[in-house]
Amino acid sequence: MTVENAKALFFERNLCALTPLDPERASAFLADLEARAREEELAGVVALLGRKKAADFLSAILDLSPFIREALTRQPRILDRIVSATPESALEAILDEISASGTVAGVSESELMTSLRQLKREAHVLIALCDLARIFNTETTTDRLTDLAEACTGAAVRFLLLDADAAGRINLPDRSNPEKDCGWIVLGMGKFGARELNYSSDIDLIVFIDETKPAIGDPYECVDTFSRLTRRLVRILQDRTGDGYVFRVDLRLRPDPGSTPLAIPVGAALHYYEGRGQNWERAAMIKARPVAGDRLSGKQILAELSPYVWRKYLDYAAIADVHSIKRQIHAHKGHGDIAVRGHNVKLGRGGIREIEFFVQTQQLIAGGRFPELRGNQTVPMLARLAERGWITQQARDALAQEYWFLRDVEHRIQMIADEQTHILPEDDEGFARVSHMMGYADPAEFSEIFLAALKVVEKQYAALFEQAPELGAASGNLVFTGDVDDPGTLETLSAMGYERSSDICRVIRTWHFGRYRATQSAEARERLTELTPALLKAFAETRRADESLLRFDGFLQGLPAGIQLFSLLQSNPRLLNLLVMIMSAAPRLADIITRNPHVFDGLLDPAIFSEVPTRAYLEERLRAFLGSATDFEEVLDRLRIFAAEHRFLIGIRLLTGAINGVRAGQAFSDLAELMVGRALEAVEAELQRRHGKVKGAKVALLAMGKLGSRELTAGSDVDLILLYDHDKDAEESDGEKPLAPSKYYIRLTQRLIAALSAPTAEGVLYEVDMRLRPSGNKGPVATHIEAFGKYQRNDAWTWEHMALTRARPIHGDEAFIARIKVDIEDVLAMPRDVRKLAGDVREMRELIAQEKPPRDDWDLKLKPGGIIDLEFIAQFATLAGYVKKTPRPFATEEVLANLDPFFADPAMVDGLVEAHRFYTNLSQAIRLCLNDSAGLDQFPPGMRELLCRVAGLPDIERIEYELLEHYRLVRAAFDKLVGHGAD
């Protein structure tokens, strides 16, 4: 407040000369106001408007501020308050009326709402008039706006306390002073707490409950009681009625607002801040101040929070915290020039936020050691920082001057329409309104002065952080503090390629609130904060940035801890890029690591990409992983964990190109053999514990299908047949609960199937398919070796002999396995009518084509000329004796490569082998990335890039062309070798 004429009436003082945009329009507005004053018989106001000084000043304001014009025209008695009283005393009278309104006997909630809205409008207009006239300086304006908000909040709180007491929900110790010891703590935050409110501010509140206070009734109901009161408080202040609103209320600065009640017990709040409080919350608490309710308890909780806000020692961790906040607020180095029109006075470059943050960061670093630096107001703290030598006198003076200048501009932007905006209008008239209200009739002059102010602030702000480590991963605002979307951040995310910027902001704020196990520790959140710009940049470089980042969020939700992974990603760009590749290209792998985050642990092995996963490699690691585990369930759980991790790691090698599709098929098969064999051993031991052994028992597992040919893909089930033998005189097992041999091995097989395929907390080992056993699902699940041989020699269909070409014993008694191999080779070597064989194969292929037609050109298996045709050629050639290699190969590609020249000429063989390898590389990648069969339109963009890489081709169109060529070649070969050309 200016000292001169402090006791003079408003229009007796020296007023800032303002000029309207349109003098004629201004005169018309003044005439309308005079007419309204006459209607309400306000003789003093009519006389005032007849005086030139008042008329000139008010007509300019009526033209420049539509909001003030509407308020005065609607309520001209506002001016009557300053006809015979000083503006200071008039404002005090309004504040007194507001304060008393909450305790008026018999007043209803709706009556209070009406009274507060009308009185607030009167005070608002008076403060604006004093501000525009320069009767109040900017500091006084913010102070009076804060007084107004505090009076309104206090009145509403007192009304609600008395109402709750009358209803018996609380027990006030003193109804004449309802706030005393009520236990309802209302803290003002941000500009409200710092007494720096702007003209159209929201008021930021945090509400706590002191459960120890006598007013609290049932402590188990107090959260619900005071949350209801808080909700009513918001309604009283915020709801729009015919009289407008009082103040918009924001409760989102409370701890974890997405999952906590509106009113939080003090103990729960302290626990949150001590364990999960974030950097920005430390900064926010600097400005916290009790503004209503139980103020004594409010001061006590702030005192208890002091060690959290003010760290005792100045250390590198504290400085790193500050830099972390800085990166969340701005990362704009290298941006273009500042544009005045459309500039955000609060959040833009050189704006108010930078000055506030300049002060708060110094306070966070030094306030622990120097209590005098713990104030909650910006400009006084600039002075304290200069006194302590933390900033220069020049910086203090420059920033203080520009702070009040920018706050002035902010107020005038908001005075136009009473909207909470901080953006300078871009249109000529809107910009001129602000310029004129600032006292500049020439907008160009105002523009020049405004730009100079921004540059001063930007220079000081940049100097403060010139030593801050740069992530170099993003440009533009990246602000994820609080619970409100930052407009600049939304723009930055959109520019980076995100389509759902608001959703992405919400997700990242969830990380910061520590709602996931991986982000509950302060250190983990700090690491993730450091990593976030790099993550955003990496995901933005995929073609579906939003989808990929949301998959990463799902991964975080399942992660048991985060520090190690976040540190690893931060220090290892290759691993970060790999994770992004998984999220963008391989939904199936992303789902796996989301459900089982432990599989990612394998990537900590630095040799993961250089060592090929051979059977010996896997055996060595399995032995170490199982260790001394002997308990049946423990062994199975360890097998499940091991299998999940190594399936994932084989997939990662394929994804990154460390191995090709053929090698991946071999590795997936080797892993499955080990897992199935070790599971059988565990099941046998468990069965023997209860039922003993069968005399002369011999057991073996026969791998069929792709496991037999060592061509498993990611997610393949395993085709198995369990074969057994025993002494002829064995009638039952020798255990406590003996079983007949046939029942014994059926029980063994059933338990093996359960061990492999039962869903558990650690997942499923493998889905098992045993339909290739003799008689399929109609036959027993375990097959005696003699029954197996007899069936294959006498009763098996051609398709069963085709399947037998891929049969391979993978686990069991060595002598028994040797016998099985001989039996299989004898069956395969049986003399056959080649023409009938070819006819059977053709008939089977035609049946498949009818019952399972190909989905599209990407159905590599079922498409004519696809994988089935190649497998049928290989199986037909094996049964017909057209494979020249000994011992007989199992893998389709190896069979094709060894076709007898008189059956298929070398050029055809080369074409078939090339086609099979092309299909294998593509199908392995597709099965790795997707859970289900899908067409091209469902392939994620990152997966398309992967397919181009594994195919060695530049684009999808070229792959499709090559596919069609291979289909044509293979189909022609099938027709020649197996089709009617073979007859």
From Swiss-Prot:
Region feature (Adenylyl removase): 1-468
GO cellular component: cytosol
Region (Adenylyl transferase), start-end ranges: 473-983
Top-rank taxon, per record: Bacteria
GO terms (BP aspect): regulation of glutamine family amino acid metabolic process
Essential cofactor(s): Mg(2+)
Catalytic reactions of this protein: [glutamine synthetase]-O(4)-(5'-adenylyl)-L-tyrosine + phosphate = [glutamine synthetase]-L-tyrosine + ADP; [glutamine synthetase]-L-tyrosine + ATP = [glutamine synthetase]-O(4)-(5'-adenylyl)-L-tyrosine + diphosphate
GO molecular function, one term: magnesium ion binding
Known EC number: 2.7.7.89, 2.7.7.42
One Pfam family matching this protein: GlnE
Keywords, alphabetical: ATP-binding, Magnesium, Multifunctional enzyme, Nucleotide-binding, Nucleotidyltransferase, Transferase
Entry annotated with the keyword Nucleotide-binding: yes
Enzyme class (EC, first level): transferase
InterPro entries found in the cross-reference section: GlnE, GlnE_rpt_dom, NT_sf, PII_UdlTrfase/GS_AdlTrfase
Record flagged with keyword Protease: no
UniProt similarity note: Belongs to the GlnE family.
Described function: Involved in the regulation of glutamine synthetase GlnA, a key enzyme in the process to assimilate ammonia. When cellular nitrogen levels are high, the C-terminal adenylyl transferase (AT) inactivates GlnA by covalent transfer of an adenylyl group from ATP to specific tyrosine residue of GlnA, thus reducing its activity. Conversely, when nitrogen levels are low, the N-terminal adenylyl removase (AR) activates GlnA by removing the adenylyl group by phosphorolysis, increasing its activity.
Protein name (record): Bifunctional glutamine synthetase adenylyltransferase/adenylyl-removing enzyme
